[in-house]
Each structure stands twice: as C-alpha cells, then as structure tokens.
Design a protein with these regions (language model features):
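The catalytic Nudix box helix
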Residues: 39-75, 130
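Active-site-adjacent beta-strand/loop module that shapes the phosphate/pyrophosphate-binding cleft
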Residues: 77-115, 127, 149
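Alpha-helix-centered segments that form part of catalytic cores
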Residues: 116-132
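Short, charged/polar surface micro-motifs in flexible loops or helix N-caps
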Residues: 14-17, 26-29, 45-46, 82-83, ...
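N-terminal strand-loop-strand
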Residues: 1-39, 67, 89
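Functional cleft and adjacent loop/helix regions within the main domain
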Residues: 35-40, 46, 91, 151
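Charged phosphate-binding loop/patch that engages nucleotide di/tri-phosphates or the phosphate backbone
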Residues: 127, 131-154
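Short glycine-enriched loop/turn motifs at secondary-structure junctions
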Residues: 38, 83, 119-122
C-alpha cells in the first residue's frame, strides 16, 4: 500500500535561487546534517483531503506560521520511497522571513525500550538554503524536487 504526503517548497531569488527547508527534530537526526532536512510536508489520505490543503496544514503544524500569500504551483508527484508518494507545491516566498517559528512536537519512547515517553520538535530549525547545499541536506527522496523547481523557473 502506498502512503501519500504533500509538501510546500518556498523559494526565492536572493539573488541566487534559495529554498526554505527544515532540519528534522528528535534524537535520530540531532547530529546529522546531510540527508537530515526536509521541506514542510506530511501525510494525507487521498479522497479525504486535498493535497494542497494537506501541504498548507503541515506547513502550519511544522513551522507554526501560515504560508505566505501567492500562487501555488504543483511541481508534481515524486516517489519519496518505494512505498511513499509526495505531492509538492512551489510558492514564491520572497519577503518571507525565516524567523518566529513555533515548531510542532511529537512524542516517542525515549530512550529506546525505557518505557518513558519524551516530546521532541518535528523540526528543530528552518532556513533559506541555496540549491547546492539543499541537494546535500535534503533527504534523498526529495532531491528531485529541486530539479523540478529549476525547470519551472527556467
């Protein structure tokens, strides 16, 4: 069975092309940089929620802010993994400041097999990043999204 996610990739030309990405939170990602970043995104159930609505909801939940106003462009559907599909929207985020975030949280057993539950931020920081750095930082399944964004803006 395939799981579906939707995400919103903000971009700006500052003067070079940059994207807003977020470092995943929690103990697994704490000491990682390469492959440990993501666009704001999350799961949705096709037929029960529209991908764009899910992308907006996840942006709000993960970053604690509303996405800026503007024209959303669907970049496409990407195979994030063999069992997960990701619908991505692009939005010009010129003027959107990467500050004032209120990161959403999740709970998990920590330390493992301890029987104790701890809360961690879904993401622990977000920032504007040039495309070369973003290609290294993004999780592997999201890297093709950057190529699609470049094609859109060419």
């Amino acid at each position: 069975m395939v799981a579906w996610s939707a995400g919103l990739l903000l971009y700006r030309r500052h003067p070079a092309l940059e994207v807003l990405i977020a470092h995943m939170g929690g103990p697994f990602w704490a000491r990682k940089e390469s492959g440990a970043w993501s666009m704001p995104k999350g799961e949705f159930e096709p037929g029960a929620e529209e991908p764009r609505d899910a992308a907006r909801r996840e942006f709000r939940e993960e970053l604690g802010l509303e996405p800026p106003a503007g024209e959303w462009v669907e970049l496409g559907t990407f195979a994030a993994t063999s069992s997960k599909r990701l619908v991505v929207f692009a939005l010009d985020g010129t003027g959107f400041e990467a500050s004032g975030f209120v990161f959403g949280e999740f709970e998990m057993e920590w330390p493992p097999r301890s029987g104790r539950t701890a809360s961690f931020p879904e993401v622990d920081r977000a920032k504007w990043t040039g495309l070369d750095a973003a290609r290294d930082r993004l999780v592997k399944g999201q890297r093709p999204v950057l190529d699609a964004l470049e094609r859109l803006l060419a």
